[in-house]
Structure formats: C-alpha cells, structure tokens
C-alpha cells in the first residue's frame, strides 16, 4: 500500500487574533508544523497547539520563520547565514520546551514561508537551517521542498533525514520550485484540480508545471494549508480520496 504523510501549518493565531482552523483540521492530518512566535503564534498558542496535537496523536514539528509578524514571514529578508542559524535554533528550542513539558517528543522542523523558499534555492540558508537542527537534536527530520538540491545537500552534510515535500494547493514552475505567491496563478483554488495534482504526485511521481511540462516529484509528505476559507472541507475531501485510493496516511518513521 502507498503511504504518504499529510502535514499542515498550525498554531498561527496571535494574542486576540485567531487564524486558521486548527481544531477542525487536526483529525485529517498525520503531522503538524507549529509556528514558533517569529512570523505567527505566541507562547500560549504554542502550548495549546502542542496539547491538541498530542490528543490527536499527530507528529509535532517546529515551523520557524523570519521575525516578520506584519508580513507573516512571507517576505524575503536580507540576513546572513549566522542570523538564520540563530533564528531557527531559538525557535525550535522554544517549541521543544513546550513539547517536552507536555510529555511529547518533537519529530521534525519545517521552515516557513520566505525562509523555506530561500532555503530551497540558496545553499547557505539551507545549510544554516540544517546546522541548527543538527546542534539542537540530530534525530529531528527536515521537511523541505522535493527535488531541492540545497535541502538535499544540507541534510546529507549534517546526516539528518530529509522528508521531501510537495504542496496540494500550490502551482509549480518548470524547475520544480513553487510559483511565487505574488503571482496570480500561485494557488490552485479548485479543489478537484488540487486533488488531481496530489494524486499525480503520490501515485505517478510527477506534477504539471504552470507551462504544462511534467516535473518529477518524489514526495514523502504533502502540505495542506489550514487557513483558507474552505481548508477544512478540502482536508476532509483529500483524506477521503486517499482512503478511496488505498493510500495510507501516516507520519514519516
């Protein structure tokens, strides 16, 4: 039976501001990425998200981003590799404290937004992220964009496990990178089209780029975004589609 991990970015509320559909999404995913306070989230939200994840028995990962609350961590920043290392180590350490306090164990790290996209094409940024993971806990996996040489080389250098990731509702360019959110066609808004893309990636190992070219994708995890208007409906639909196609949903071992 084919096996795939479904991951989702959660814990993105901040103070009085609620974001996402965390409670409704949790039953349909096998792992989550928890915002660590730089681009979203706060200490109370981090604790509550960890506790809920443990109740649903899903794998818990840190979701470190740039210190950019106003831009939600989606804007590129001109930072050094040392700064990236510091940002990532600080954030994953904070989440790990909450996970340990709840009696759990953190499984992975997935960079957020602009940090993720920069790392996918910038070896120095990817290296800094992998080094922070290695120094924090080398048993943690790194979730990174499928086929990214920067992520692959960084994970190999520090001997950490890379879990290659694809996206259910994002379009791809011919080089295998994601279409920028600044472009109109970055998101797939039609649920049926998104599910068709996911099945192609999981069962056939490719995705159609925005120009119609086939791009090879060997994904071990699929990202669902939990903050969209129909996020819960889509999560439920993809979960049932996988069941129908005898695709087992579970976190990477």
Curated annotation (Swiss-Prot):
InterPro entries: Glyco_hydro/deAcase_b/a-brl (IPR011330), LamB/YcsF/PxpA-like (IPR005501)
GO biological process: carbohydrate metabolic process
Annotated catalysed reactions: 5-oxo-L-proline + ATP + 2 H2O = L-glutamate + ADP + phosphate + H(+)
GO MF, any single term: 5-oxoprolinase (ATP-hydrolyzing) activity
EC number of this enzyme: 3.5.2.9
Keywords: ATP-binding, Hydrolase, Nucleotide-binding
Top-rank taxon, per record: Bacteria
HAMAP family listed in its UniProt record: PxpA
Record's function text: Catalyzes the cleavage of 5-oxoproline to form L-glutamate coupled to the hydrolysis of ATP to ADP and inorganic phosphate.
Family per similarity comment: Belongs to the LamB/PxpA family.
Subunit structure: Forms a complex composed of PxpA, PxpB and PxpC.
Name by which UniProt lists this protein: 5-oxoprolinase subunit A
Native organism: Bacillus anthracis
Source lineage: Bacteria, Bacillati, Bacillota, Bacilli, Bacillales
């Amino acid at each position: 039976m084919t096996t795939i991990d479904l991951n989702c970015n959660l814990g993105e509320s901040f103070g009085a501001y609620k974001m996402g559909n965390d409670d409704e999404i949790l039953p349909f995913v096998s792992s989550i990425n928890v915002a660590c306070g730089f681009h979203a989230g706060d200490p109370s939200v981090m604790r509550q998200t960890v506790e809920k994840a443990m109740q649903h028995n899903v794998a818990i990962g840190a979701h470190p981003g740039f210190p950019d609350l106003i831009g939600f961590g989606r804007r590129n920043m001109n930072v050094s590799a040392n700064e990236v290392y510091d940002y990532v180590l600080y954030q994953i350490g904070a989440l790990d404290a909450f996970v340990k306090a709840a009696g759990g164990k953190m499984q992975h790290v997935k960079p957020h937004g602009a940090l993720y996209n920069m790392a996918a094409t910038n070896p120095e940024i990817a290296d800094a992220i992998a080094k922070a993971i290695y120094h924090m806990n080398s048993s943690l996996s790194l979730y990174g964009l499928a086929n990214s040489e920067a992520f692959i080389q960084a994970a190999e250098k520090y001997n950490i496990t890379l879990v290659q990731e694809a996206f259910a509702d994002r379009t791809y360019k011919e080089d295998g990178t994601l279409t920028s959110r600044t472009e109109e066609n970055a998101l797939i808004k039609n649920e049926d089209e998104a599910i068709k893309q996911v099945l192609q990636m999981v069962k056939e190992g490719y995705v159609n780029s925005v120009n119609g070219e086939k791009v090879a994708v060997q994904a071990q995890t699929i990202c669902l975004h939990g903050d969209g208007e129909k996020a819960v409906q889509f999560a439920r639909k993809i979960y049932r589609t996988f069941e129908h196609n005898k695709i087992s949903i579970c976190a990477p071992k």
